[in-house]
Amino acid sequence: YKIDPEASEKKIKRSNELRKQLGHYSGAMFYYAGEWYWGIDRLYHLEKRLMELGANKDQSDTLICPRPEIVMGPLKDSGNLKLRFFPSLRSPYTSIIFDKTLELAEKTGIELEISPVLPMVMRGVPATMQKGSYIMSDAAREAKELKIDWGKRVYDPIGEPVINCYALYPWAKRSGKGDALLREFLQCAFYEGINTNSTSGMKLVVERAGLDWVQAKSRLYLGEWEPLIEKNRLDMYDLGCWGVPSYELSDSEGETLVATWGQDRLWLISRAIQNYLKESKTSNE
């Protein structure tokens, strides 16, 4: 077939303009009647919507592309596996999967290392209004599927709140409260709409995490967090991941078994854990 470069360029331009008009920022997306679907990972939302309209010919309620289940067992690790979790404190996706990630580690017995990174816009990655709007609406759909009461009240923690929390993180981690500090920050920002940019908001985060606010205040302006957070970013990039949350599952030799990006990939990590433990059990019998 003969290709007309000028016609192709015009077609691409028109399509990009239409996509922007409909409220999205990226390609390879599905759009149906006012709602966007990010590739095959979101088709189950579309399937459910079409089923509600009675559009499925066989009247079956079985999905073609269901959201894969996050399996929490039955096998349990005994010191062989390590899961590295890369969250950020401004990420809606991080906020809906943070507790599930901790639960997976606890129930399977794997070692969990939380490696926070700066939010993308604080790393110099540009973000459009369309992108921000889509991410919030998509995270709300995903949270509903996970049966999480999320996003009814949100107070964007961009900037100083994130830096303040990261400034406290090394101290909190040494106190055995690092996970709790991050969790409470996300809870306040994305579940309760608390202004973490206020003294009272940050004080609430700290005290909910089981830490002393008087001690915390003296650590807010220490710079020890910066090399740690930057190292985490570089490590994440080395895995071929750029966004959050990202995951790396490795064995006792430090070899990467799975490295992946997205809250909608925790199911993959969970299955990789069970597959590894099953193979190890079989080889030892």
Model-derived regions, located:
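C-terminal cap of thioredoxin/glutaredoxin-like
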Residues: Y1-G73, G79-R84, I97-L104, E184-E285
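Structured beta->alpha junctions
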Residues: G34, L89, D156-P157
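Structural alpha/beta surface segment adjacent to cysteine/selenocysteine redox centers
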Residues: S95-A189, L277-N284
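Short active-site neighborhood of thiol/selenol oxidoreductases, capturing the structured segment around
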Residues: D77-Y93, L112
